[in-house]
Amino acid sequence: MRIALVVEYDGSQYHGWQAQTGLHTIQQAVEFALSKVADSSISVVCAGRTDTGVHATNQVIHFDCEKDRSIRAWIHGANSFLPKDICVKWGKEMPENFHARYSAVSRRYRYVIYNGAIRPGLLRGNVTWQYRQLDHRLMQQGGQCLLGENDFTSFRSVECQSNTPMRNIHQLQVTRHGDLVVLDITANAFLHHMVRNIAGVLIAVGSGKHPVGWVKDVLNAKDRKLGAETAPSYGLYLVQVTYPKEFGLLQNNPGPLFLWEK
């Protein structure tokens, strides 16, 4: 039996998703909780391996288990064993050909910036702080050259292990909601640190450090050293993973909860 679950987590206190010996990770916490429910060892596969400090509102995972458990038991049972900053939101039994990573057709991230003169207290681990005034309209304008299929060498980390720098960005939008500036970006897949490096470049444009046309110059250069600093991890959220309709996965509100849909 193959089960898919949607998981939400605050990544502030974790060394990313992927299990690593001697480190506190999301995957280890989730597998521990599910193994308790199954009364046997469970290994999970996720849609997107988020980095240290990165959050998710709708991470999708799957696992195989022959134990007879209802979806309600998987959800509520796992939540009873999970730490308070991780929860299972939804679940469904899936066909054997479903794969949380390889069946996905797109992934959507949001990068949230608190743009105010004073650093935030309550949201300090959940947003990136920029005290310089950002013009979200310039950021939106600059980001449009990244749409479509491109070589994103300038926006990948030096540790990126992908065989190709080619990715296809389906949509990129920058909006302002009071003091919050939100980068919303969807692509078929992302390179290591790609969203954070795009955010760094657009922040440089929004603050007036570079002109709008500089974004395209960085893209065309295919050189990571010519871009901006990588934006911090704690403003980044995996908010949606899209699959073919045949799988019937619920599309939850992207979130995070302190944002609203426009």
Curated annotation (Swiss-Prot):
Keywords: Isomerase, tRNA processing. Substrate binds at Y109. It catalyses: uridine(38/39/40) in tRNA = pseudouridine(38/39/40) in tRNA. GO terms for molecular function: RNA binding; tRNA pseudouridine(38-40) synthase activity. PANTHER family: PSEUDOURIDYLATE SYNTHASE, TRNA PSEUDOURIDINE SYNTHASE-LIKE 1. HAMAP family: TruA (MF_00171). This is tRNA pseudouridine synthase A.
